[in-house]
Amino acid sequence: MKEIGKIIRERRKSLKVNQLELSELAGVGINTLVAIARGEGNPKLKTLLSILDTLGLQMTIELKS
């Protein structure tokens, strides 16, 4: 979760969007967003996908080799 949080933080900063703006655009609570960005908590997949989509990111699932 920490790696995802780091990616979210870096992308948000590169887009020059603050946490409150991102939480509103993604339709998630500010406390939820802050926890995810810190690599904490256990967010619902729907919440995580909403944040990623808002940032222009996507999550990929691959088979182990």
Report the location of each language-model feature:
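Short alpha-helical DNA-recognition segment
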Residues: 17-32
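DNA major-groove recognition helix of helix-turn-helix/homeodomain DNA-binding modules
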Residues: 46-61
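Short basic helix-loop element that most often maps to the first helix and adjoining turn
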Residues: 6-21
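Short hydrophobic/aromatic patches at helix-to-coil boundaries
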Residues: 2-3, 60-65
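Positions in alpha-helical segments
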Residues: 6, 31-34
